[in-house]
Amino acid sequence: MLINNSKYYSLFLFLFFADLVYSQNSANGRIVDAKTNKEVSGVDIFINENQKPSLTTTSGKFTVQSDSLIYKLRFLRKNYSLESVDVTPQNASNIFVKLAQEKVGSIQEVVIHNEKPKYKNKKENPAYAIMQKVWERKRNNGLDKFDTYTYKEYEKIQFDANNLDSAFMKRKIFNKLEFIFNYKDSTASGKIALPIFLNEAVYENYGENRPSKRTKRLLTAQKTSGFQDNQIITLMAKNLYRDINIYDNTLNYFDIGFPSPAGETGFSTYDYNLVDTISIRGENAFKIRYQPKRTEVLAFQGYLYIDTDSYAVLGATLKSTQKINVNFINGISTELEYDNPDENTFLPRKFVTEIEMTPFSKKKTSKSIIAKRSVDYSEYQFNKPLEDKIFKRTEEEYNDKFVEKDDAYWVKARPDSLSKSEQGIYDMLDKLEQTPKFNRIVKLYETLGSGYYNITKGIDLGPIFSVYGKNQVEGDRIRIGARTYFTRNDPWRVQFYTAYGFKDQQVKYGVEGRFMFNRVNRFTVGAGTRRDILQLGVRLTNDDGIMARTFASSTIFARGENASLSSINQTNVFTSIEPWKNFQIRLDGTMQSIKSANPEGFNLMYYKNGDLRKTTNDSHFTLSLIARPGAKFSQTGIDRHEHGTLAPTIVLKYTKGVEGLFGSDFNYNKLQFLFYKPFLIGSWGKTVVSFEAGKNFNTVPLALQNVIPGNQSYSLAQNTFAQLNYYEFVADTYTTLHLEHHFNGKILSYIPLIKKLKLREIAFIRGAYGTLSDASKAINVEGFKYSAPSEHIYYEYGFGIENIGFGNLRIFRVDFNWRGNYLNRPDISTFGIKAGFQVGF
């Protein structure tokens, strides 16, 4: 396998996450009276945007220290004007401050001392009156007003390793890699920041609102830091950010809802304080400070800048609180600027977001990665005729040469010049790519990250995490697999596995090959075959393809004995295409024979024309329509990496069984539907909805029937019923609904002591209803055993605790499940506990 350059960036993050060391910021100087030049004592010194003084001086000299970077100091003393000094590496020592006297009682005193005025009710608060005007004149994105529009977008994404020091640089892991620190950048306090990734991109945006609504975002230029295949890290970085509208009630960060300070529901979360009137780009603006009423909630603090005449939002700063309860995140900071061409619309001008990420600790001194994304919007044009071909351009999106530009282009395209450290990133990562030691570390990291180990060029072994399993039929099971792998964007791939059970002493296998002819519409063909023991009936809407695996046939820990396994011999051919973005049409042809893998404990025998048969022979075609509107993917090859979004999944499948084709025993028609979607519910968290429905229109034996999916393992399994046994409910016609709400700690944050653990609560309810005809029961030898949840809707409910762990590493979840009805059945479980790992923010 070729070394995958895109993983260098991910490895770089991993290396800097590996060690945690302490570093401190400091500044010192002298304070005098501007008129007399005499030293002044009793001065309150504020660091950065802090609202409480970090020091009150006892003499004219001062020294301040902070766990975070000091970039600004503010000095305030009674009867003196506020003085602010920007701190840089050049002036951090021996800062000379002159304070000018003024009248007592200026508005700045109220602002800096954070003396929040006490009002009998919010209507007495002048900030409330201003925010009411903002809500009354709430603006819409101006792009929707025009028939057509175009604009230019410049995006810069940068990763910096932060809080480094000389001790960190001497770690053994950097032996023979010391040259990377020649590109370091020192902060004002002596800390070291090392730029490790830079991506620049220019987009042309086109839109048409009338007569039909169409948009096109075309990448016209891109420059990356060193490696050629950087797409996955670039899109991973972009996936950290979401497009936000400051007027919305909820702002989406990491698919977690934060209440907007400019939303109509803001006063339920924030306290507001009018602190000043300032000028922004020649416009007078109210400066309103806001902060959350409770620091334990997911919310921001910062400033809103409101036009004094039109009450439009000219800008905003959003900064997370110190107690932010988001995994792997130490802090979020966003600055927004808007243009307001008229009283009803706003246009984005500039967005800058910084995210500080650490793997384990939330201490400010921890080593971290600063991910910064800045976007500049310019060259707006409206109501100009747009040719139809603009919206049909696709080839350039898959052609790297189209976006290659020379240095002269980038000098002109950048709104601001690159810093010296940013310019050095390109050279540093080119050198790193040629270092043998780093490439060896890359290989180890790739193995842990992908689950595959490269043995020679283009061949990987794996997945290594699926080597061992256990079930009632096979006993201990060993599985070894391999795949072809040259690059992330391979247009073809062959996969193979073989497995052996020490109890049944049988060899199993599977092999599949796929080839993609066109990257634009992803026209793909594939074929495969397998002979294996599987747990059928754990999913209603199954994934098609030979290499799709089922968890239950190799579960190590389970509730009760699982004897309901099937021996399957299956061959599949398919073709698929995406005629529109994120909409796939797939046609499968499948030939299979299914029999019980444990005839003594699980009977799949059925009657056909009066004959008793133990093997179900089936040939069928399946047409699948799969829509994923809004989904994001990072590769263009046969296998794509999907990034987490709130995009829905909508699947419609029709299956036609053909009797007589390759010895098939049944004609049948089956229709299935699936809808899955996460929804943000403001500050109350996120609700995940999964709905499935289906119908078999003909009589088929148990091996081809719809099984309401149970879960007898102790692991979490999506879209299954935790308290159902396998094959407990079977249905010709079925509907299921899973509702799961993640509160993000909203309730537990009110409980003393518990709130310090930063646990998050989950509540869920699941239901299933279906019918099973007498004919479908009679066709099976043991049909009397099977029934559908037709008397009542079967339901189970419960709650869970997620975010269990320490520091920033909180990936464990435990669910407590109760069965709601059908309690008089034999061998059921009325209560159960499931646990598992889930990695996310």
Where are these regions (language model features)?
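A short, solvent-exposed loop/turn motif at the edges and junctions
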Residues: 47-49, 74-85
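Structured extracytoplasmic
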Residues: 116-285, 291-299, 361, 365-458, ...
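Short, acidic Ser/Thr/Gly-rich low-complexity loop/linker segments typical of extracellular
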Residues: 50-61
